[in-house]
Amino acid sequence: MDNHNSSHQLYKKAMALVLAGGRGSRLYNLTDTRAKPAVYFGGKFRIVDFALSNCLNSGIRRIGVVTQYKSHSLLRHIQRGWGFLRGELNEFIDLLPAQQRVDEESWYRGTADAVYQNIDILRSYGPEYVIVLAGDHIYKMDYSVMLRDHAQSGYKCTVGCVEIAEEEAYAFGIMGIDEDRKITSFIEKPKKNAPTIPGTTDRCYASMGIYIFNSDYLYDLLEEDIANKESSHDFGKDIIPRVVSENQALAHPFSMSCVPRGEGIEPYWRDVGTIDAFWEANLDLAANMPELNIYDKDWPVWTAQEQLPPAKFVPDRKGNHGVITNTLTSGGCIVLGSQISKSLMFSKVRVSAGCEIDQCVIMPEVVVGENCRLKKVVIDKGCDIPAGMVIGEDPIEDAKNFYRTDKGVVLVTKKMIDELKEK
């Protein structure tokens, strides 16, 4: 059987489970009203769209989305933008809120518990393989390649991993592997002595939060884990170390299945779990030749599409046309005679005359008043920035009025603006 037919048969036997219930507390006020996977990204998308699009483009069309924290906007987004799969062809996206399976007061207590609470639903669909995905990372990956790697290996679990510098290991689950890619150790967020990639002294393999299991093996692991009162019911802390101890875990480097892939191509994967990382990943897209290609017709990023008029750039009352460079602009935006560079504007943004905007991420329905100066600012949905406001130039004022990171990125939310107006 050739690889194409083999992959086709495999993805028909697989079901993906996207874990999209996380709060994302390191994004601070950006997740006050929404779960991290529902946060806006890239000018028109939500973070969860990348994992869901990877599923679709990989041929995986049986998908469960596990939700919990402030899930309304996420549920609405998926219902509006992802309702085109056809149930009569055994295609679906099943929305899975916490089942309170353990007791009537327990919500999801960890990533493994989130899957366990949906174990009956998984069994009812009868997949041979279960693909567990984090719903809060930015990347393009062909899961069918990883699935084929898993099926051909004979291992019962395969863990997607990305190469990182050793000094970054403290933030990830790090795996040690042998020359055949068998995982020999797995350490969650090591502070020192992280296992390095064979043949290197300063590079590590970090877990991407992507796992493929033989389904029966996964069910057994989850049922044993839930009975263990000492467990934190987490894949990285409990399940994967158990699999490694049983010699059943294979490492799958992201470079094998990233899109695109090939010699000289640097795989693009970002954990946008902090304001700085979120801002940087968005601004990556404003580069002349961005590392992440969102214009690839062969691997599109799907999302909910609101019917909006085209963006419009017009001169101000004095006839000043303004200058827009290296900026992504979505439908429904209107910009009057302003200078905007290296920025992203989501839908229905209004920028008044005389503004200077540099390296900003401006979410939907934001109104920027006249003569504002904004630099390195993330502006949440629905903010009304008063005329003449300056953000990003005075660290002390920024920290007093908004949330400012150590790297100088300023987060502005509607609540912050409203409180500032009341002073």
From Swiss-Prot:
Homotetramer. Pfam families: Hexapep_GlmU, NTP_transferase. It is an enzyme of class 2 (transferase). HAMAP family: GlgC. One of its GO terms (biological process) is glycogen biosynthetic process. Involved in the biosynthesis of ADP-glucose, a building block required for the elongation reactions to produce glycogen. Catalyzes the reaction between ATP and alpha-D-glucose 1-phosphate (G1P) to produce pyrophosphate and ADP-Glc. Pathway: Glycan biosynthesis; glycogen biosynthesis. Alpha-D-glucose 1-phosphate binds at residues 108, 173, 188-189, 207. Its EC number is 2.7.7.27. GO terms for molecular function: ATP binding; glucose-1-phosphate adenylyltransferase activity. Keywords: ATP-binding, Carbohydrate metabolism, Glycogen biosynthesis, Glycogen metabolism, Nucleotide-binding, Nucleotidyltransferase, Transferase. The gene is glgC. It catalyses: alpha-D-glucose 1-phosphate + ATP + H(+) = ADP-alpha-D-glucose + diphosphate. The keyword 4Fe-4S does not apply. CDD domains: ADP_Glucose_PP, LbH_G1P_AT_C. Belongs to the bacterial/plant glucose-1-phosphate adenylyltransferase family. This is Glucose-1-phosphate adenylyltransferase. It comes from Francisella philomiragia subsp. philomiragia (strain ATCC 25017 / CCUG 19701 / FSC 153 / O#319-036).
